[in-house]
C-alpha cells in the first residue's frame, strides 16, 4: 500500500481525495490510500484548489503560498506538499 502522509525533510506530503461542494470543511479520514478532505468550494475555475491551499495553510499554520499542489490540479486525487508546517493537525498526526 502507498503512503498517505509522509515527511520529506521539513515538509509534509499528503495524498488527498477531495470532496468538493461539501457543507463544511473537514478532514474525513482515510479513503483507500488517501486522506479524504471535504471542502465547501465548487470544482469550478480553480476555486476548489484555491480553497484547499488556503485551508491547508490554516490547518498547518503556514502561508497559503507554502502549500503546493504537486499532482492532480484538475482532479479529485491530489498530492500536496506543505513546506515547513508550524503545526500538524491531529487527524494527520494519527496516520503519519
Curated annotation (Swiss-Prot):
Q: Which InterPro entries match?
A: DUF167, YggU-like_sf
Q: Which family does it belong to?
A: Belongs to the UPF0235 family.
GO cellular component, as recorded: cytoplasm
Recorded coiled-coil stretches: none
Q: What NCBIfam families has UniProt attached to this entry?
A: DUF167 family protein (TIGR00251), PRK05090.1 (NF003466)
Q: Which PANTHER family match?
A: UPF0235 PROTEIN C15ORF40 (PTHR13420:SF7)
The family database entries (Pfam families) matched by this protein are listed as:
DUF167 (PF02594)
| Name the UniProt record assigns to this protein | UPF0235 protein VV1_1522
